[in-house]
Amino acid sequence: MAGSIALTRRGPLARVTLANPAKHNAIDVAMWHDLRATFERLQGAPETAAPRAVIVCGEGGQFASGGDIAEFAGFRFDEARLHDFHERIVAPALEALLACDIPLLAQIEGACIGGGLEIAACCDIRIAGSSSRFGAPIARLGFPMAPGELQLLSQALPAPVLREMLLEARLLDAAGALRHGLVHGVVADTEVATHVLQRAGHIATLSPQAARINKRTLRQIAAGGPNAAERRAHFGYADSAEHREGIAAFLEKRPPHFQRG
């Protein structure tokens, strides 16, 4: 049975669930396509209708155990098909997450392996359960990590740790992931969902405009910018309602109430 990507909405928050529970949420080709479509849909939503934060999680107490190995024989042994899988299926899906202006929070439980680790690395805030584990032990399967995916992980982990993880097919436990900055917090397994929901709820009270512009600027910096035009455009928020509301609320000693539109 194929896996699925489910998008649900509750108030200002959305949830994207990786669901292939019979295989610990292994990500099949259809799920990569659906993941891309889901985040392109979120990014394309009108600002007045978009959620203020998105929680990315797995079904059934696991985040994602990697790719669906049962599908590998269909493309991995042909160079052109293998290239297309990584560059035309996986890469655009990950890019859709990275290009999303909405804050993304990874709710990590259990296995966060391979493609699951890459998806988590695209999220802005990553919270792990104490028994979660992280890695990409694909050297055991006889293949290396694709260049774009390795570049992504190199931005989430120190180079020595990433080398050890890949060359020794080593897994990190939650404490190690926290120590090396891969995750922002570790809580008891039973508290992960509640903790992430609380953090997402807090983000939802803040300026969505500020989040959107901050994420865009961080992407520009990662790409070697911002350039002169991007620097100029950055200040277009000056006369916005959110900017005025935030300053007014501070001066009036009240919580801000940010409304889009």
Label the predicted regions.
Residues 21, 127-132, 183-228, 239-241, ...:
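C-terminal long alpha-helix characteristic of the crotonase
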Residues 93-99, 107, 113-166, 180, ...:
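CoA-thioester-processing core
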Residues 1-59, 95:
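Conserved CoA-thioester-binding segment of acyl-CoA-metabolizing enzymes
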Residues 125, 164, 168-170, 176, ...:
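Well-ordered beta-strand positions
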Residues 2, 248-261:
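Terminal low-complexity tails and localization/encapsulation signals of metabolic enzymes
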Residues 66, 87, 91, 114, ...:
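Glycine-rich phosphate-binding loop at the start of an alpha helix
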Residues 58-93, 142:
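Glycine- (often His-adjacent) and acidic-residue-rich active-site loop
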